[in-house]
């Protein structure tokens, strides 16, 4: 894409004709709220594990994640019905998918309804659906069950993104942006939904990396409505979406590795991931900002909606880009309140971004109109979108 029109760079914050905008946000969570301080004892009791070294390691990890609360689908009722999920080595993929397929649909429908309510228009005005999940596997896919659950028209066009991991929310937003800008009058529902049950396992000395996921990841769903040329009577755009790019790093595909096995998904997260992101994030951001015609902008003159993959990743990004501490506050808050919720997290970050931008406006401080929406996932893949905050 070319540089941003000079008129758009002025002080008047109206959406640019033909540009995709985020018109509403919504979220949903399962009923089980987990306090991080009680997680270790509960997890080891549930899985009947008494290994003191593993318990000490998980205790240390829980203290370093900065997570305070998370929501999870897993419950005593589920384990009572499927006790094999907490036993090492059993073939449980069928049971897991039965639980996950239903759970992600339920959460996606709830988040979408909340989003549509915030949007204020009729559900019949939705023309396209982009559905993202790394927590289910079935034919037909969750996109159809979401459309069915919402009562969408059979004519609704659907796109399905499976197993995109933590970059899925921004990848879905990029796809929704392209749909909205190439189909005048369209309104795209982007829904993301994730649950960790697909990879829930008892602790094992053979899989020490599993404990990182136990300490960090959470469940939930997110939703957005995306469309261009908002109706000034009934729509209030939140963010305008400009340049969007994707980049994968060659020879890093084993850094975030997931395999669907008889025991569910086995994840391996390399310790090198934070360093890999730190080493490559600046060049990626320069490329993104340059394509948008904003190379003159200082990083601290922009907002940063970054997927909260973990505190180490956020700390390294902050250090490498020399960002002021408040720049990643929305990401850190999302991590603290919801954990790393994979593709959903960017919705939660954007909600906090809007909340904090309103506080800045009320305090008569400098507003950051332009910014970046970033996420990192398997590949290692970088996703980035230049956005304009229209709500400040």
UniProtKB/Swiss-Prot annotation:
Gene Ontology molecular function, alphabetical: tetraketide alpha-pyrone synthase activity
Reported tissue expression: Expressed in flowers and flower buds (at protein level). Mostly confined to anther tapetal cells.
One Gene Ontology CC term in the entry: endoplasmic reticulum
Major localization class: endoplasmic reticulum
Acyltransferase listed as a keyword: yes
Catalytic residue positions: 166 (nucleophile)
Effect of loss of the gene: Pollen exine layer defects. Reduced accumulation of flavonoid precursors and flavonoids in developing anthers. Plants lacking both PKS-A and PKS-B are completely male sterile, with no apparent exine, thus leading to pollen grain collapse under vacuum. Altered pollen-stigma adhesion.
EC number annotated for this UniProt entry: 2.3.1.-
Keywords: Acyltransferase, Developmental protein, Endoplasmic reticulum, Flavonoid biosynthesis, Transferase
Field pH dependence: Optimum pH is 7 (at 30 degrees Celsius).
Biological processes, Gene Ontology terms: flavonoid biosynthetic process; pollen exine formation; polyketide biosynthetic process; sporopollenin biosynthetic process
Cellular localisation: Endoplasmic reticulum
Binding site for CoA: 57-64, 269, 309-312
InterPro entries recorded: Chalcone/stilbene_synt_C, Chalcone/stilbene_synt_N, Polyketide_synthase_type-III, Thiolase-like
A Pfam family this chain is assigned to: Chal_sti_synt_N
Pathway listed: Secondary metabolite biosynthesis; flavonoid biosynthesis
Positions that bind substrate: 218-219
Family classification: Belongs to the thiolase-like superfamily. Chalcone/stilbene synthases family.
Subunit structure: Homodimer. Interacts with 4CLL1/ACOS5 and TKPR1.
Function as written in the Swiss-Prot or TrEMBL entry: Plant type III polyketide synthases (PKSs) that catalyzes the condensation of malonyl-CoA units with various CoA ester starter molecules to generate a diverse array of natural products including long-chain alkyl alpha-pyrones. Accepts up to C(20) chain-length fatty acyl CoAs as starter substrates, and carries out sequential condensations with malonyl-CoA to produce triketide and tetraketide alpha-pyrones, potential sporopollenin precursors. Favorite substrates for are midchain- and v-hydroxylated fatty acyl-CoAs (e.g. 12-hydroxyoctadecanoyl-CoA and 16-hydroxyhexadecanoyl-CoA).
Protein name: Type III polyketide synthase B
Provenance organism: Arabidopsis thaliana
Gene giving rise to this polypeptide: PKSB
